[in-house]
Amino acid sequence: MSVVKTALPATRSGESSQLTGPRFLLASIFVSSLVASLLFLKFAPAPFFWLLLTWAAALWSAMFGVKGSWPRAILFNLGIVPCLLAGIEAYLVTHEYTPSVFSDGFYVRDDIMGWVPAKGIKGRATKANPIGLLHHPAGTLFDVTYTMDSNGLRAAPPYNKDDLAGTVLFFGCSFAFGEGLNDDETLPYQVGVQSGGRYRTLNFAVNGYGSEQMLAAIAHGIVGRVVDSTPRYAYYVALPVHVWRAAGRVSWGLHAPRYVQAPDGTLYQEGNFENRKPLAVRLGLNPHIGGQLNKSAIWRMLGMHDSHVTDDDIRLYLTIVRRSQELLAAEYPGIQFRVILYPYQDPAQRATYQKLREGFVRMGIPVGLVEDILPGYITDRSKFILSAGDTHPNALANRLLAQYVLKQIAR
């Protein structure tokens, strides 16, 4: 009786071990990357930079757990995407504008202007240095006190009532208000001090304002109620970004006055601008998910991205400035309205800056270019600004600008 030996298939233990190894590797990579991502979101100063690098490394590590050149090529190329995004995130994190923090109650809502500083208050303003990829904000860029008078205007120096040569009004945004500076370092304050008290200065500028608040303050009688001595000069400190604000093409509105222009050129106010809804809300995302995504500088940039301005927006802005000049001239005959124009702070504003220069000249409004007043400002503005990450004018810039204003007035 012969015994037939049947060849049994090879034990599955070897095959199982061959499959278990890659599967275990891939599972380990996925789980460890997920845990690392959660820890980064919880504790890291720039979580999405590290999170993206983690997943780039995970995809490249997964190449050792798959067979075949095509799967490996796909994983390699997929890993490039988060790696590139990590580079963008790193750049934005280290160059992102850091907002100031104000003491409670410093700003209050206003139906006309949108927001105003509280009257008769001393408010503290602080600004942290930018965060790094390896550290949270280290120290502060500035820690200053803003003194507001009984009219809600930034503190002005004493003036000689018996030898008063005139009153000078200032309008504008944080550049004229004096962001990050002590009271006596602002442009209006320096004009008063350097004149020896012969000129009284009134600073109607406020952080975030633009031409629309200047017009609203004049049209609604806010300026008229404050000014009790005939002003001889009015200076509007302008920036190209004011065009975006006047057209409502910024992510924040804060109930700012909204002006529109009719087909016949008539300018009128039509309600107010309000804040744009957060990107997560617009996309219908869960608030918790939106909060986590907001830890990404890329996400914040997308949510805060300003629309492009058009030639119509520039015309609207120039019309607002012109109307402001006309109302001041009607209320204070003989007043001289002038513009101090800062150059573009962002390359995207370059064309707008040039059109504003041409527009002011075309309207016959005297304009002083900061790039001409502050020597070397265009090529190297470092000595005239607060820091590399904050281009607001420093005390030196305002002292030189004040000298320019007084020379213009003396002519």
Which residues fall in each region the model found?
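Short, intrinsically disordered terminal tails adjacent to the first/last structured region
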Residues: 1-20
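Internal/C-terminal transmembrane anchor helices
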Residues: 69-95
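Extended hydrophobic/aromatic segments used for targeting, binding, or gating
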Residues: 192, 197, 202-207, 212, ...
